[in-house]
Amino acid sequence: MEELLHISFVNDGRDIPSELDEEEDAEIVVASDISDNDLKLQFWTNALPVIVDAFGGNSTYSNVSPAPRSTLDGFVGISGVNLYCTMRLRKHTLSANIWIDVKDKEKNKRLFDVMYARKDNIEKHVPYNIGWNRGDDKRSSTVNVEIEDVDFNDTSRWPELTQFLATTCVALKAELITACEDELRVVIDGN
């Protein structure tokens, strides 16, 4: 087996070769020393208070506790319409989502259409691409806003990431759920 040689350069006043020059704010990316579940728990523990505050306290995420899961579900008051956040460690993505499933495919599509009619309004409030998935071949429908290339081990980015979730979830709820709540309830109730 080949023997590995470890070389360490100590800044002792000698010139550092130009090819090894240090950058003042060089960022070193290292593998996380914690488990995926611990990382998820730490991220949600950090993010949840910011999300709760964005909703004004006693609201959508106020009764939610951090957990070592990939998703964090909020309560919007309409059965079958769900607002949730997702962190995917392996895919390096973070998203705010609406999932529609009232156990009736036709109603789900009508609920999606009510929200989709507000597409122009939500796009004014969310500066990211919005994924509209009516899912005609499935029972459920989704709306999601996702950012990619997220390194969850880089805790210096957590404030930016939690702010993304907070502002995006508030906008999704305000523009696609609260603003059309009466229409959504009419579809669900079958009137």
Outline where the language-model segments fall:
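Hydrophobic transmembrane alpha-helix bundles
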Residues: 3, 93-107, 162-179
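Compositionally biased, intrinsically disordered low-complexity segments
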Residues: 10, 31-32, 53, 189-191
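Ampiphathic alpha-helical segments that act as solvent-exposed interaction surfaces
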Residues: 114-126, 149-190
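Polyanion-binding interface signature
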Residues: 28-148
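A short acidic, often aromatic-flanked loop/helix-cap motif at beta-alpha or helix-coil junctions
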Residues: 1-2, 15, 138-140, 151-152
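Acidic metal-coordinating catalytic centers involved in nucleic-acid phosphodiester chemistry
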Residues: 1-28, 32
